[in-house]
UniProtKB/Swiss-Prot annotation:
The gene is argR. It is found in: Cytoplasm. GO terms for biological process: L-arginine biosynthetic process; protein complex oligomerization; regulation of arginine biosynthetic process. One of its GO terms (cellular component) is cytoplasm. InterPro entries: Arg_repress, Arg_repress_C, Arg_repress_C_sf, Arg_repress_DNA-bd, WH-like_DNA-bd_sf, WH_DNA-bd_sf. This is Arginine repressor.
Amino acid sequence: MEKLDSLNEAFKSLLREEKFGSQSEIVTALQEMGFEHINQSKVSRMLSKFGAVRTRNTKMEMVYHLPAELGIPTTSSPLRNLVIDIDHNESLIVVRTSPGAAQLIARLLDSMGKAEGILGTIAGDDTIFITPTRDTSISTLIATITELFDSSL
């Protein structure tokens, strides 16, 4: 467990430097720090786990970093605290979330699937597009989604 903790600390320390633009660069840096068994898939999982996002640093380079303004959303965070707004037009529903929470919530929505009227989702950092199934009305799907976010998990 101690080795995992030191890996996590080294990983977070590297991301705070805001100079790594690819997962392979992070892998190389961790290997140079003595974590020789690290690979790209492990780094990818860690990026998701810690809520890392790619943004432009002060040099205008796209780099990975940890969002500072909010805690990392987890599956134990109440959904109502992560969802900021729900809006729609005649064919799509748009959900605005706290930074870093969109992919977590989109994954939850995707798991509901076609039976609940969700054909699919596309998530960025803080925005989700939801496409309803052919036979589901926008109003019905909004009611389902709103109920999910209002429930206490």
